[in-house]
Amino acid sequence: MANNNEIERRRTFAIIAHPDAGKTSLTEKLLLFGGQIQVAGAVKSNKIKKTATSDWMDIEKQRGISVTTSVMEFDYHDYKVNILDTPGHQDFAEDTYRTLTAVDGVIIVVDGAKGVETQTRKLMEVCRMRNTPVIIFINKMDREAKDPFDLLDELEEELHIHVRPLTWPIESGVRFKGVYNIYEHNLNLYQPSKQVVTEKVEVDIHTEELDNRIGAQLADKLRGELELIDGVYPEFDKEEYLKGELAPVFFGSALNNFGVQELLDCFVEIAPSPRPVKAEEREVEPEEPKFTGFIFKITANIDPNHRSCIAFCKICSGKFVRNAPYLHVRHGKTMRFSSPTQFMAQRKTTVDEAWAGDIIGLPDNGTFKIGDTLTEGEVLHFKGLPSFSPEMFKYIENADPMKQKQLAKGIDQLMDEGVAQLFVNQFNGRKIIGTVGQLQFEVIQYRLENEYSAKCRWEPLSLYKACWIESDDAAELEAFKKRKYQYMAKDREGRDVFLADSGYVLQMAQMDFKHIKFHFTSEF
């Protein structure tokens, strides 16, 4: 039986950003306020001063970037908060896309000096596709930043969404004095501190107390700007926000712990509790009494001391109970889970029960694939985001004949995670890895060596696109595969994939074989 109070208090969201906008720093500070950590690890200039809690994989600690989604949960006031800290690096966009299928809201971090960047636009497009509610945190206001009104204009123009500031900065850089909380009508004066929680000051902006706090000149400027905000921007409307049409905006400095508590306090109040999830068969409501959930991520070796996988399951409805029987829909088998876990980055604890909105980890020995569904018996298939055609391709070869088994296992597990895509060329039988960018090849090589004791080498392969093909005309499909036999491959699901080596070749193939459909995503 679903407990509506438990479901209502859940807040499950992702933090997304362009690389180096301060996303992991913000995650750390939210955990600090949530009481999960005592010291936040500063990620600065790609060097780790103290190890960031949410960057738990060795390669992340070395490089100072996030390369995989971390899942963390904590209680804050009367709410249960689940944070998914996603990779900011552009090469790991697919991991972020999949994560967005498992959240009910998103916080976008924007660098105050740089404004909206490429990756932010792409991620916002995915949020728009799913009507995901968005909150924007403009970070690094303690450094020289763009004019806040210019930033708001840029957000509206670039992200195609209406905005409403709920806090407002008093200057930036060396002149930065703090932020005024429009939502709660109080002043938060800036004290650079990576650990100390700054106190709020209740102040009426129309009295001399404001002048005494920040000086008459800045006080007059702040009053004028707040008046302009009320005249130009719409009042905050929670319904518009929940529909993904209005984004509240906050200003601060995550690294120096400033403006973060205002963001968190407002977020838990206005952010959505678990939302309905669409399955191919029907829409699933979170309050339904029966448990349903889907696997959105698989991580190998979350604990390097044990060669195990964890499948991350987003609970869509009802209540999950440890050791209860659940149907694995794709296999048609009943499974029980004796050690389901929840996370604080790499620290995990066994849970006896979890509710709609929660993310739980299930031990996986190869049973799960991304997109798998678990239910109490009903056959459901949740709709997710597909894999996209990779941008780069390389042959992967074994560099140590004695470690063939380890290499095969490592490739299988990493592909299950969705780090990259694997194709097998039907002409020569060689394995091809397809990725979004170069860094993924480095991560795969590093992890194969450090987690599986297997060595690989890469051989460049010049390809334009991987296209999944299908046709109602079996004869034409067979004729195409015969003509293009050198460029035909199979993906891990056994589907036919055409590896086009140029845009011209693809265009000619589409013209010559009009009854064949060429798809650039794996779901069609």
Q: Which stretches of residues belong to each language-model region?
A:
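Structural and coupling elements of P-loop NTPases
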Residues: 1-524
